[in-house]
A protein has these predicted regions:
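PRY/SPRY (B30.2) beta-sandwich protein-interaction domains
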Residues: 2-529
């Protein structure tokens, strides 16, 4: 009996290591622990400083530079991902956006590296009490699915990963985890094979889990509203069922005469079926203008701030350009002006101007104090355009924040309500179809909705795949503009000499779409009668 116990003990021992090997192992462990502590600190430093980046040409914070350097090697990349999962808190409004920014700027990982990370997460053990950790895991999975679309994305969506994300929808008690599980599933579904796999998994349940969340899209809770928006968007655009009508077929558009313009929007912005709510879940900076233009008088609209992160909301003319992949949006040229209530900045001509501090008020959500010029989820941003006095004013919850005049040095008319969105941001516009919460009391004004008129066809917000199918059926003339496919291509760009653009589209270009060279002059051809 004693011999048997000794035998068992010998088998259970760790393999013998020479003293030198043991020291090497201890050093490796210590080195890994030190690296983890350093990376944790760098991630938190980046999170703290990200709001101070106010210029696209500005050098990134040193913490970000160090993280990118560490992530150049596989072990470093894995450590950066682990640290983001472990240390980014739930209550920071830019937490998910920082994960997206860091992963987007890091070197593209290999499929094997991502699979290693998935195993480290131990996704077979779904659920758990650490909601922030699970939220961060879902954000990272979504980012990886977007960056590695195609066969690599299929490999990442293992049975454990799919079960983890679906199980979060069913059993997670935290709406943040549910929201980013939905977004991760959406990112994986960009690959057709994954889309079919996810759809099959959802249909295996007695009731599609997304159906119960769709009902939240009109909730008074901003977090529930986000979940409802994303669930409805997935059901309309990705996981379509014959049993369910599209939202545009059932939405009530009574009294809505101005909407966000689905034909004047950057490519990845999501717009609700009623045309009044917008959300960005892409890593790019997405923008949109409304359908109604104003040239004189005094005008006002309001925006419900659903997420408290970085958005630039205000006014723009048609000459304002959307350069979503370069990070330029409303307020980033001389033909637009916007307010960013997350960083408390006014944007114009790609330059920011800090808004003077207002007295602080208690933030009941986080038990902290915040400036009255800083928005939070549920805030109402008021945007007033006075073309009699040539001024624009912004207010938060009825309190004036700032008055601006600089836009009128470059534009006097042709203004649209407009906005740009960073990753995971959402808001709802009120152009007058509902009573305003905080209407101006110091001057008479008009709402867009009281003057504008849309016909029934113009009010339809089609799901993206139906819109693209509709475009494919259009007959295109040989001399049509290669950008809008609407007007005749009569412009030659100089000095590159590329052709194929109409007058209106050429005015929006800074670089040639063909060769990316700078445009110095556009020459219009004479049109023979």
């Amino acid at each position: 009996m004693g011999t048997c116990f000794c035998k068992d003990r010998i088998e259970e021992r760790e393999p013998y290591l020479a003293p030198r090997s043991r020291r090497a192992t201890v050093c490796e462990r210590n080195s890994k622990n030190i690296l983890a502590e350093q990376v944790n600190k760098l991630v938190l430093d980046t999170l703290a400083m990200i709001g101070s980046i106010v210029d696209n040409e500005q050098d990134p914070p040193m913490a970000m530079v160090c993280l990118h350097s560490i992530a150049d090697k596989e072990a470093g990349w894995i450590q950066v991902v682990e640290s983001m999962v472990d240390v980014i808190p739930m209550d920071h409004p830019l937490g998910p956006s920082v994960i997206t920014l860091l992963l987007d700027d890091c070197p593209l990982p290999s499929k094997d590296s991502v699979i290693k990370v998935s195993k480290l997460f131990d996704l077979s053990m779904s659920g758990g009490e650490d909601s922030a950790r699970h939220r961060n895991i879902c954000v990272i999975l979504g980012c990886m699915a977007e960056k590695l679309a195609g066969p690599s994305s299929v490999a990442i969506l293992s049975k454990d990963t799919l079960h983890y994300l679906i199980n979060n929808l069913i059993s997670s008690p935290d709406l943040h985890v549910i929201l980013f599980s939905l977004i991760a599933l959406e990112k994986f579904a960009q690959t057709s094979e994954n889309k079919a796999t996810i759809k099959k998994k959802l249909s295996s349940h007695p009731v599609n889990p997304l159906y119960k969340f769709e009902a939240l899209c009109s909730s008074e809770s901003c977090l529930e509203r986000q979940v409802g928006f994303c669930a409805r968007w997935c059901l309309d655009n990705l996981f379509v069922s014959n049993e369910r009508k599209y939202s545009y077929e059932t939405v009530d558009l009574t009294g809505i005469e101005v909407m966000l313009n689905t034909r004047d929007v950057s490519e990845y912005l999501k717009i609700s079926p009623d045309g009044l709510e917008a959300r960005c879940d892409s890593y790019s900076f997405e923008s949109v203008r409304c359908t109604f233009q104003v040239d004189n008088g005094v005008w006002y609209y309001e925006t419900l701030i659903i997420t408290s992160g970085i958005m630039q909301i205000g006014w723009a003319t048609k000459d304002s350009t959307f350069l979503n992949h370069e990070g330029y949006g409303i307020g980033d040229d001389e033909f637009s002006l916007a307010y960013d209530g997350c960083r408390r900045l006014v944007w114009h001509g790609a330059r920011s101007h800090a808004v003077p501090d207002k007295p602080c008020i208690n933030d009941s959500t986080n038990n902290t104090e915040r400036s009255m010029s800083q928005w939070e989820s549920g805030s109402i941003l008021g945007c007033l355009l006075d073309l009699n006095k040539m001024e624009i004013s912004f207010s938060l919850d009825g309190v004036e924040v700032v008055v601006c005049t600089q836009l009128f040095e470059h534009a006097k008319s042709g203004f649209f309500a407009a906005a740009s969105f960073m990753s995971f941001q959402q808001c709802k516009f009120n152009f007058g179809s509902e009573p305003f919460k905080y209407p101006p009391t110091d001057r008479a004004f008009k709402s867009f909705n009281s003057i504008a008129k849309l016909n029934p066809e113009e009010k339809i917000v089609l799901p993206r795949h139906l819109y693209l199918e509709q475009l494919r059926k259009l007959s295109i003339h040989e001399d049509s503009c290669t950008l809008c496919f609407d007007k005749r291509a009569t412009v030659t760009l100089h000095p590159c000499q590329h052709r194929g653009f109409c007058v209106d589209c050429s005015k929006l270009l800074l670089h040639c779409p063909m060769c990316r060279s700078m445009i110095y002059k556009s020459e219009q051809e004479e049109i023979s009668s």
